[in-house]
Amino acid sequence: VSGLSANAVLDSLEAAAGRFVALDLRFVVVALAFQLANLALRSFALRNVIQAAYPERRISPVTVAGAYAAGVALNAFAPARGGEALKIALLRLRIPGSSVPTLLSAGVVLTLLDALIGSSLIATAWGLGALPVLPSPPVPSLGLLAEHLLVVGGIVVALVALTATVARPLARRARGIWARVEQGGAILRTPTRYLRSVVTLQLAGWTCRIGVAFSLLAAFGLPATVPIAVLVVVAGGLSTLVPTPGGAGTQQVLLVYALQQTATTAAALSFSVGMQVGITAVNTLIGITAMMLMFRTLRPVAAVRAARAARP
């Protein structure tokens, strides 16, 4: 049995290697163009949100694009989307008078539409059976539930008492922080401007993400249709929910399952690995280049060190 298993593994590896060799570079170039466009569109949408928060000063699209690209690059290697901290730190450093709560709130504005689109696509994919269904958790007994309710109730009472004790001294500071948070979402007060300068760019960015998946499916010789490309994007988005660098491992499992009706396991695995490695390489190259420009150095290592020093 072990001999057969070893042969099966070798056959799968050979099949995967063969797909890499047979890549259609024309579609790879198209995928690269879509990826660059996606990064540019999303960074410009973020710039417009920040510009609305700070109308008295001009926010450079290049500054925001550099910080955004650096954050995306780090997300591929840091767990739990650690690149977001770098993005905020670089924006705080390059935008005089800006504050962390305002910049964080500006980033949240972008997640509103992303969450709506992403959750809709995920729900549709699960409803069609394209994604695995998680098992239902066991129902606790009434006695155990009552014990937990008592514990939770005690904790809530303690928290309320503690909050009442420290709330007054912290109230003034909390109001100041909340004012800065509201400042970050200032563009939402002008729905027309929000739709024109943010939503349209985000929708175009989502189209580019689907274009990346579609082009890479074609490059690997797999069935390339819009529904399958959307499924690939959904699997990639779900993989980021697991706190591993770039969703590594999780993305491969989800894509192998999602593509089981249209591709062999070896083909789906080689496609998933190739797509993740390729996108990570592109994002990393762009991110390092952006940091070199922001810190005005020709040495990539020096740029990375400067970016690390800028992180909170």
Where do the protein language model's features map onto the residues?
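Predominantly cytoplasmic-facing regulatory/coupling regions of multi-pass membrane proteins
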Residues: 1-69, 127-241, 267-270, 275-312
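Short helix-loop-helix connector
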Residues: 53-54, 93-95, 220-221, 259-263
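Membrane-interface alpha-helices at helix entry/exit sites of multi-pass transporters
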Residues: 61-66, 84, 96-111, 263-274
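Hydrophobic, aromatic-rich membrane-embedded alpha-helical segments
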Residues: 63-93
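Membrane-embedded alpha-helical segments of transport systems
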Residues: 70-78, 101-126, 270-286
